[in-house]
């Protein structure tokens, strides 16, 4: 497989890069597909007379083939343009074992590239960039709903913790393991699913993931003991987490720089709105029935998504699309020589292990750009799951909201929506400057993060210091603070993700998998100590600690705005734009 050199400028909008996929394989758009079937060559070759000195049987056949190709300049079966003379390979058969059965060696075939299929120019309707807008919008909705179902499954379990503690006679931290193990599954699986999607395509990975996710949620809902619940929760997260790494890569497949930022914005909202929306829905479910219906609801939702992906989602991975095109042409023409470049990829077990496990991890710890951005992103993601424990402490224990105590989460969603609109507007400004200057470095994606990095610690400190005094301060005050926190969550997460994708475009799935691996680890760990920290230190001082950490990370986007291009220039994987 080939990839763009890290020292060559890359313009996502440039015609020569229009067909680049977010994978390790490049496809060069071309309008020509030359087909020389071996049976045709033999047929034509048999009409050529041998005018040279006496040759061996094999040499005569080879010479005949070469003469046939030169003498039969004709129209291709595939395109009605004249086919140029192909380059014929010369093969030394002297050291080869016999064919068997007394048969001579077959004639030498032309260069393999003559048979390679490509996209038919930048306007090829087969290319995902050129799919109808209605089709791409439908696929985006399906993929975003898939992400929401996965992330809702992580936090909806929190509203059933009290019932689980009573039924199975365990302390809350044991029940919270149901959340931790689920999110640990998020951390474990993307490093496998994302590179696999670059080898075998997006569709198969998403179909398997959505089916397995629905299956294991039904298993949790029907489990008879706590051990089964915990094991099935882990596998639900492990199998279901593929969209968290594959969906951004699928969006990169379908959209160029003009639209990609907006599509990733929708994905980010799905990742963050799901965990916040789930407790609001779950609180109403547990008020009227048992915790098992929390899992039944997610399982039914996931089943509907599985059906939608199975019947409506088309393969978007560019090299995999060309593989399908080659198979169709072989079937229609009978020419077994037609192939896609991606079909020539032969991976050993070692190479598969490197591409599915070690590469994302190696990238994470050897790429300073990816590591620093991921640490910041992971801290923000951990805060998201920490709030699942902090909000009940403030509003249920402090303000006495024992019924519908999860409603203040809605302020977080409002803040996220406001930030989504802000980033959408900033993306329009990004594109205006992109067209004016003829290109922008990926660091330009970090500008919204500068604002969000300041707003985020304000929201945390506001929430914790006002929520610590429920007898003096009205509940609406810490509730409003949630809008600032939600603004910061999306405003930091989304530019980080866009920056990673723009910087590692050809291997975006692996880069996102590395990011998902670390941030899911943070998301799994934070709920375990959240209760002890807020109850032990007090809501105010726990918030002070988190706020100071958030303040310490404010300079991160500023540093990359200044030093990012130089870091990428020295990178093994990132583009030097």
UniProtKB/Swiss-Prot annotation:
Where found?
A: Cell membrane
Provide the residues annotated with a glycan attachment (glycosylation): 44, 58
GO cellular component terms given for this protein? plasma membrane
**Recorded superkingdom:** Eukaryota
Q: GO molecular function: any one?
A: transmembrane transporter activity
Stimuli inducing this protein:
Expression is up-regulated by clotrimazole. Expression is also up-regulated during biofilm formation.
Membrane-traversing stretches: 137-157, 167-187, 204-224, 234-254, 263-283, 293-313, 368-388, 406-426, 446-466, 475-495, 504-526, 541-561
What Pfam families does its record include?
Answer: MFS_1
Biological process terms in GO annotation: single-species biofilm formation
The protein's topology relative to the membrane is: Multi-pass membrane protein
User: In the UniProt record for this chain, what is stated about the effect of gene disruption?
Assistant: Leads to intracellular accumulation of clotrimazole and increases the susceptibility to clotrimazole but also to other imidazoles such as miconazole, ketoconazole, and tioconazole; as well as triazoles such as itraconazole and fluconazole. Also increases susceptibility to other antifungal drug families such as the polyene amphotericin B, the pyrimide analog flucytosine, the fungicide mancozeb, and the polyamine spermine.
Region of interest (Disordered), residue spans: 1-63
> What broad class describes the main subcellular location of this protein?
membrane
Q: Does the keyword Transmembrane apply?
A: yes
The UniProt entry, under InterPro entries, shows:
MFS (IPR011701), MFS_dom (IPR020846), MFS_trans_sf (IPR036259)
Query: Transport: is it a keyword of this entry?
Result: yes
Similarity comment: Belongs to the major facilitator superfamily. DHA1 family. Polyamines/proton antiporter (TC 2.A.1.2.16) subfamily.
* Protein name, entry field: Multidrug transporter TPO1_2
């Amino acid at each position: 497989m080939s990839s763009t050199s890290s020292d060559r400028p890359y313009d996502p909008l440039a015609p020569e890069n229009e067909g680049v996929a977010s994978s390790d394989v490049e496809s060069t758009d071309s309008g020509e597909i030359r087909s020389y079937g071996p049976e045709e060559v033999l047929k034509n070759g048999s009409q050529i007379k041998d005018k040279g000195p006496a040759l061996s049987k094999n040499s005569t056949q080879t010479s005949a083939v070469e003469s046939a190709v030169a003498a039969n300049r004709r129209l291709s079966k595939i395109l009605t343009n004249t086919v140029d003379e192909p380059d014929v390979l010369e093969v030394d058969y002297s050291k080869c074992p016999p064919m068997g059965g007394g048969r001579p060696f077959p004639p030498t075939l032309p260069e393999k590239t003559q048979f390679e299929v490509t996209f038919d120019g930048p306007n090829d309707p087969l290319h995902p960039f050129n799919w109808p807008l209605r089709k791409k919008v439908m696929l985006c909705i399906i993929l975003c709903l898939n992400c929401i179902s996965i992330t809702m499954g992580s936090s909806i379990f929190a509203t059933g913790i009290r019932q689980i503690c009573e039924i199975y006679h365990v302390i809350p931290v044991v029940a919270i393991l149901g959340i931790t193990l689920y999110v640990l599954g998020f951390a474990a699986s993307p490093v496998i699913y994302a590179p696999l999607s670059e080898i075998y395509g997006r569709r198969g990975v998403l179909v398997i993931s959505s089916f397995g996710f629905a299956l294991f949620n039904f298993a949790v809902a029907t489990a008879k003991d706590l051990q089964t619940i915990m094991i099935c929760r882990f596998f639900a997260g492990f199998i279901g987490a593929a969209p968290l790494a594959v969906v951004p890569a699928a969006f990169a497949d379908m959209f160029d720089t003009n639209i990609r930022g907006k599509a990733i914005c929708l994905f980010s909202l799905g990742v963050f709105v799901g965990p916040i929306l789930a407790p609001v829905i779950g609180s109403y479910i547990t008020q009227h029935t048992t915790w098992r219906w929390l899992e039944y609801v997610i399982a039914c939702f996931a089943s509907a998504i599985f059906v939608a992906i199975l019947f409506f989602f088309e393969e978007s991975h560019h090299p995999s699309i060309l593989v399908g095109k080659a198979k169709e042409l072989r079937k229609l023409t009978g020419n077994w020589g037609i192939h896609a470049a991606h079909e020539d990829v032969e991976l050993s077990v070692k190479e598969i292990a490197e591409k599915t496990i070690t590469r994302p991890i190696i990238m994470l710890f050897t790429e300073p750009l990816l590591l620093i951005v991921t640490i910041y992103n992971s801290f923000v993601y951990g805060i998201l799951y920490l709030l699942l424990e902090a909000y009940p402490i403030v509003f249920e224990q402090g303000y006495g909201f024992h019924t519908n105590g999860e409603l203040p989460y809605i302020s977080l969603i409002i803040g996220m929506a406001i930030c989504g609109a802000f980033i959408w507007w900033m993306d329009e400004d990004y594109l205006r400057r992109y067209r004016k200057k003829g290109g922008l470095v990926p660091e330009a994606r970090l500008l919204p993060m500068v604002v969000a990095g300041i707003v985020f610690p304000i929201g945390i400190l506001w929430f914790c210091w006002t929520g610590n005094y429920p007898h003096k301060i009205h509940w609406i005050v810490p509730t409003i603070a949630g809008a600032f926190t939600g603004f910061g969550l999306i405003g930091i997460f989304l530019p980080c993700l866009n920056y990673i994708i723009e910087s590692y475009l050809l291997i975006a799935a692996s880069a996102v998998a590395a990011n998902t691996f670390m941030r899911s680890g943070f998301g799994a760990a934070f709920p375990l100590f959240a209760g002890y920290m807020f109850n032990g230190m007090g809501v105010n001082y726990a918030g002070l600690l988190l706020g100071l950490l958030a303040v310490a990370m404010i300079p991160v986007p500023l540093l990359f705005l200044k030093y990012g291009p130089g870091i990428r220039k020295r990178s093994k994987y990132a583009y030097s734009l």
